[in-house]
Amino acid sequence: MKQYKAYLIDLDGTMYMGTDEIDGAKQFIDYLNVKGIPHLYVTNNSTKTPEQVTEKLREMHIDAKPEEVVTSALATADYISEQSPGASVYMLGGSGLNTALTEAGLVIKNDEHVDYVVIGLDEQVTYEKLAIATLGVRNGATFISTNPDVSIPKERGFLPGNGAITSVVSVSTGVSPQFIGKPEPIIMVKALEILGLDKSEVAMVGDLYDTDIMSGINVGMDTIHVQTGVSTLEDVQNKNVPPTYSFKDLNEAIAELEK
């Protein structure tokens, strides 16, 4: 197995499933830290701030720092502020998205007369929120969605994801959003900029082919699939472009790296 200078690592299905740590996750991060290999946690979860993500990882005894976390909310805020500094935004989403947009100098409004409509996972979504978002897009606001995941793994099973919520506005308006998170290149390019490395020097680690693995493939990066979440070994082997590597878990990845 190739030795990479850095790793981009998914969270849900790779580091943990819901509130349960996945076997090998802590060991993999400990291995990278001992070797002095930088890594970033890249997640489509827009509801949490980097500090909240870090706290969850630390509760599982997985080493993490806020500056090592790249959320779809952060990538979304950066994308908008680079295009339109100080723009007005109507958003659906949690505290992670609200904080990211505000700290990027964007103005959050509660009506449809805005420059951007941004959809992130909102566990308190209502018809009125969707109505305002729909009117905003119809009024000409640029339509952004943090990530396309139509379902998310939870302890109860697979629940509606942000892609499902986004589809309500998209179907109603006939407008397709610009997605920011995996598998889109935008969040991956942002992560590479933070690392200061070329895509050939970095590998993407994740469980879900359609988001994690495709995000690496879409930017020309090597990919490491772990069979600890959604996509099985059979799933990824049957794809037109399979991952560079597929392991039972991250313990198996460590064993390969140590050869």
From Swiss-Prot:
Keywords: Hydrolase, Magnesium, Metal-binding. Signal peptide: none annotated. GO terms for molecular function: metal ion binding; phosphatase activity. It is an enzyme of class 3 (hydrolase). Pfam families: Hydrolase_6, Hydrolase_like. Its cofactor is Mg(2+). One of its GO terms (cellular component) is cytoplasm. Its EC number is 3.1.3.-. CDD domains: HAD_Pase_UmpH-like. SUPFAM superfamilies: HAD-like (SSF56784). Coiled coil: none annotated. PANTHER family: 4-NITROPHENYLPHOSPHATASE-RELATED, HALOACID DEHALOGENASE-LIKE HYDROLASE DOMAIN-CONTAINING PROTEIN 2. Belongs to the HAD-like hydrolase superfamily. NagD family. Catalyzes the dephosphorylation of 2-6 carbon acid sugars in vitro. This is Acid sugar phosphatase. It comes from Staphylococcus aureus (strain MRSA252).
